């Protein structure tokens, strides 16, 4: 269905396959349009951007932009992260990319599910697609220390780190603590509070959302 839709829009299925393959290989990793274009067979950066935005406008994946702390908004010129909207969409993209499910992708898919839930609760214009989010972002320091999500919720920025593991150490939330002074760490099954940082299982967090 996806391939036939793209062909109706006069898009190339080989380019779609190569872009899908690169997206699946780079889940939760910031990408540049140039880098994605080179890895998709050396196509033009604008072509890579167009295909990704079509996937996002088709509700198949969402584009997570870098969060500018001073402006409290996206920085479109920075690298962005791409996530399938749903684990089932991962399988759709895997079929397009002619690859099989990689179990190593599970933590990244869980991260993507968290992002999807945050979008549903913070974004007001999802009917226009997932290419231009205005309240859900990621953040990375000049030393390449990353926070998985930063959401603007009722005017407040809330940093969220997904650590899908049972054992959590202070090093797992150092970046949130130093850069934001507060935040949530979503774990596999661990709870903890520590000086403005609160840890709870992903499942509990998703259950508590409206």
Go through each PLM region and give its residues.
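Active-site ExK catalytic segment of metal-dependent nucleases
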Residues: 152-168
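Accessory nucleic acid-recognition modules appended to NTPase machines
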Residues: 1-147, 151-154
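Conserved acidic residues
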Residues: 148, 157, 181
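A structural signal for isolated positions on well-ordered beta-strands in alpha/beta enzyme cores
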Residues: 137, 158, 184-185
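Catalytic cores of nucleic-acid endonucleases
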Residues: 163-205
């Amino acid at each position: 269905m996806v391939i036939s839709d793209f062909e109706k829009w006069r898009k190339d299925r080989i380019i779609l396959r190569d872009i899908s393959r690169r997206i699946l290989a780079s889940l939760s990793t910031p990408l540049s349009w140039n880098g994605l274009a080179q890895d998709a067979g050396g196509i033009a950066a604008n072509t890579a951007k167009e295909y990704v935005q079509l996937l996002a406008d088709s509700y198949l994946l969402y584009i997570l932009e870098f969060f500018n702390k001073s402006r409290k908004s996206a920085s479109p010129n920075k690298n962005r992260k791409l996530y399938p909207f749903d684990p089932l969409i991962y399988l759709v993209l895997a079929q397009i990319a002619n690859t099989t499910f990689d179990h190593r992708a599970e933590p990244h898919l869980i991260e993507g599910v968290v992002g999807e839930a945050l979008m549903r609760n913070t974004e007001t214009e999802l009917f226009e697609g997932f290419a231009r989010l205005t309240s859900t972002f990621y953040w990375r320091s000049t030393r390449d220390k990353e926070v998985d999500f930063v959401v603007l919720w009722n005017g407040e920025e809330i940093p969220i780190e997904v650590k899908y593991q049972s054992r959590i150490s202070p090093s797992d939330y150092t970046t949130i603590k130093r850069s934001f002074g507060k935040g949530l760490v979503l774990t596999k099954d661990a709870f903890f509070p520590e000086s403005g940082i609160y840890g709870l299982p992903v499942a509990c967090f998703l259950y508590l959302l409206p």
